[in-house]
Design a protein with these regions (language model features):
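Feature captures the FAD/FMN-dependent oxidoreductase FAD-binding
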Residues: 1-60
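Rossmann-like dinucleotide-binding cores of NAD(P)H-dependent redox enzymes
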Residues: 2-21, 86, 90-110
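Electropositive phosphate-/nucleotide-binding environments in soluble metabolic enzymes
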Residues: 10, 14, 18, 55, ...
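General beta-strand structural signal in soluble alpha/beta enzymes
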Residues: 31-33, 63, 90-93
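A glycine-rich dinucleotide-binding beta-alpha-beta segment and adjacent secondary-structure elements
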Residues: 33, 209-240
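Short hydrophobic core segments
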Residues: 37-38, 55-74, 83-84, 135-138
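An anion/pyrophosphate-binding glycine-rich loop and adjacent beta-alpha core
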Residues: 89-92, 98-222
Length: 240
């Protein structure tokens, strides 16, 4: 049990499928593979499932067609047509657990970095959700479980043509004021260090180089000579 998510002790997702298969074998469940379902027809208290290989009759039906995620495996969206024909209302089909493509030319320079942080998602200026964990930075934007957790809110907002902004905080365990005090004390103890040297050990070097560049503070300037505003600029870049 990790943060409310259940995993096999082996950390192998295939173990879940294997367990299901073994239980199906124990119960003598009949499995039809490579069989396309064309229609589900309710008849009295039963269902007739029309397939490309003939009809199957059942007392109960669970429709788990996999949306449009993997057409090569059969998840091509045809399940929606089947459900609609049975009278179900179909809501807009949107991505639910995906990475986020972001604007910005700097992502190339930090691609491949994995870093602990918090992602907050804003829709039309209001924070609608946030999640914390390992964030993966890619050539196109951001990924990782925290990003997946907020992505459905982004997909819905973008579908509704709303403005979406993802804010990353790479020191979520401290408030802005606490982090400013922490860096000020660190600068007092290491006054001759440059920003890149000063932040070494706290963050990935690719991230440090990006923050220093964005701060427009000379990368050769000793942190002991930083003004309060320059220090706060670094804090805001790291936390916002």
């Amino acid at each position: 049990n990790r943060n409310g998510y259940l995993y096999p002790n082996s950390d192998q997702a295939g173990a879940v499928l294997d367990s299901l298969r073994m239980e199906m074998e124990r119960l003598c469940v009949e499995v039809h593979t490579e069989t396309e379902v064309l229609e589900i027809i309710p008849k009295k208290n039963r269902f007739v499932i029309r397939t490309g290989n003939g009809n199957v009759t059942a007392d109960r039906v669970i429709l788990a067609a996999g949306s449009k995620a993997a057409p090569v495996t059969g998840s091509d969206g045809s399940g929606y047509a089947i459900a609609k024909k049975m009278g179900h209302r179909i809501v807009p089909v949107l991505p639910a657990l995906v990475q986020l493509k972001c604007k910005g030319k700097f992502f190339q320079s930090i691609a491949g970095v994995r870093i602990q942080g918090c992602v907050s998602l804003y829709v039309d200026g209001d924070c609608v959700c946030r999640d914390t964990g390992e964030i993966q930075l890619t050539q196109y934007g951001i990924s990782g479980i925290p990003v997946f957790q907020v992505s459905r809110f982004a997909a819905k907002a973008l579908y509704n043509k709303q403005e979406v902004t993802a804010v990353l905080n790479f020191m979520p365990q401290m408030s802005e004021e606490e982090f400013t005090v922490f860096l000020a004390e660190r600068a007092r103890l290491r006054p001759q260090k440059t920003a890149e040297e000063f932040l070494t050990g706290l963050f990935h070097k690719k991230m440090i180089a990006l923050w220093v560049k964005c701060s427009r503070i000379s990368k050769e300037k000793p942190v002991g000579t930083y003004s309060e505003e320059e220090l706060r600029t670094l804090v805001r870049l790291i936390q916002q």
